Amino acid sequence: KINKNSLILYDDRITIKKDLSDYFKELNLNSIKKLIINFDPNLKFKKKHITYDLNYRNQLVYNSNNLKIYNDSKCTNLNNAIYKNNLINSVNKILILGGKFKKQDKNLKYNITNTLVLIFGSQKDLFINQLKFIHSNYFKFNNLNELFKFLKLIIKFNKYEFILFSPGGESYDSYKNYLDRGNHFNQLIKKVLL
């Protein structure tokens, strides 16, 4: 036997849902309104609260009057590495690429202009095949340690303004992760410059 007083009609359930929904929308709007009304325009935010501190993402690791070195070990995409390199407005720059190559469209070639490109790792030829060198040269190395022996010589005898370590490949070929690779790069920079 069904008690008629305990039944909620279908239309009544819809009405109750709508009323609850309207109530929470109004409650939300009132909360936002309070925030806006009470907002202090002189409020200062600490930088770390509004930005992400990603290790080895465009990290300036060396800065002298003549040379800036950036560690962007987090970059695992060739397109991003080339894009960042092209943002540097200088003909005296070095781009360091390497790592485990991510598959790309074989017909797509990235233009690299006015740059000395140093490429390390077992898949260095895959990187070279994706690049179109315009007023640029490249050298290949088996690993980052070999690359740094060469780098030490060329920065001693040539004037470069920028060195960008933006590998454009994954780190798993030789490192535990991009943090491990970025840390290794920073250690090698200290050895070369000191």
Tell where the protein language model's regions lie, with residue ranges.
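Short, hydrophobic beta-strand segments that form beta-sheet elements in well-ordered domains
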Residues: 1, 6-8, 95-96, 116-122
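Flexible active-site lid/hinge loop adjacent to a nucleotide/diphosphate
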Residues: 1-21, 173-179
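Nucleotide phosphate-binding/pyrophosphate-handling subdomain across enzymes
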Residues: 13-115
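C-terminal helical cap/extension that packs against the catalytic core
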Residues: 23, 104-162
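Short glycine-rich anion-binding loops that position phosphate/pyrophosphate groups of nucleotides
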Residues: 76, 99-102, 123, 164-172
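Alpha-helix N-cap recognition
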Residues: 77, 143-146, 177
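Hydrophobic packing residues within well-ordered alpha-helices of enzyme cores
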Residues: 81-84, 127-131, 185
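Glycine/aspartate-rich loop-and-adjacent alpha/beta segment that forms the canonical ThDP
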Residues: 167-194
